[in-house]
Every structure is written in C-alpha cells, then in structure tokens.
C-alpha cells in the first residue's frame, strides 16, 4: 500500500495467539487502516513470521507494537513468548521501531473511560471505530474460550497505547 502524505506515524500492532495472530494498522490514533486475524495451522512460527513480513511490506509501518509479556499479568505460553521475540527481531532487521505494552497498561489507559475488563475495552474500541462493531465478540462466560476475534481488539488497544504513552519523536519514522 503506497503511503499518502500524513504527519501521523503508521503503527502495526500484532497480538499472537495459539491460533495465529490478530493485527491492526493505525495511522494516528483516530485512523484505522486495516485489521484482522491471520490463522496459522501448521509451522505456526514460520507461517506467522511470513504473514507479518507481508504486512510490513504492504503497509510500511514506522512502529511495530507487541505485548510486553515480561510484565505481571501476562499469561503467554512459551511458544507465543518466543514468537513475540522473533516478531521484534524481524521489525528491528527492517529498521522499524518496536514498542511493547503490558495488558495492564492497556487496561489502565481504558479505565479512564470506565472499561475494566477485556470485553469492556473491546466495546470502547468498537465505539471509537464503528467499522469494528460487526467483529465484536459476544460477552464471554467464564467457561467459554476467548473468541479469536478478540485479537483484533487487543491489537487496537496496544496500538492506541503507543499513541497515548509514547512521545511523538519516539513513534515517528
């Protein structure tokens, strides 16, 4: 995707999961360019890195955002933690800045708007970006698995944190 002139940095946020990864591309805090979930069934690490490299090539982000899995509250399995490291290395190799935020940081940012859990954060994101409303999973009961589409909302949350907590010179190309 060719990049139209804008003073806002383009941010690619990735949220790996056991099924693949959710992603969101934002240009500034109010312009959602693309979003989705990429599923990987075999050779998940290699396939995920290939799909992420394709997103980087297509959208040419100035910043890549991932979860800071080292912080309290992260429950990532070893494979996903290793994948996050590999994603960060891929971005650095392509001279893209890498930022990471804990889920707690995202929760704190959205608590100002009254959102206190992942579902309420997703609702707040869908309100901010109505184009995501159709992808909003229904409320999850304790015995239910998390809907794969939640990766989209987690990614948008990470990207918005990048704009909220980073100084402009740290996210500009």
Residue ranges and their predicted role:
Residues 1-173:
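Phosphate- and other anionic-substrate recognition elements at nucleic-acid/protein interfaces
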């Amino acid at each position: 995707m060719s990049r139209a002139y804008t003073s806002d940095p383009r941010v690619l946020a990735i949220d790996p999961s056991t099924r693949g990864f959710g992603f969101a591309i934002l240009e500034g805090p109010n312009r959602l360019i693309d979003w989705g979930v990429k599923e990987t069934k075999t050779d998940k690490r290699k396939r995920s890195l290939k799909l992420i490299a394709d997103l980087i090539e297509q959208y040419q982000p100035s910043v890549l955002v991932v979860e800071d899995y080292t912080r309290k509250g992260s429950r990532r399995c070893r494979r996903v933690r290793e994948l996050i490291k590999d994603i960060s290395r891929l971005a650095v190799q392509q001279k893209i800045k890498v930022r990471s935020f804990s889920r707690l940081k995202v929760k704190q940012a959205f608590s100002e708007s009254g959102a206190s859990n992942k579902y309420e954060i997703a609702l707040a994101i869908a309100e901010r970006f109505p184009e995501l409303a159709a992808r909003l999973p229904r409320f999850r009961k304790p015995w239910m698995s998390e809907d794969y589409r939640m990766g989209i909302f987690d990614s948008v949350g990470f990207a918005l944190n990048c704009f909220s907590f980073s100084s402009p010179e740290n996210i500009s190309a």
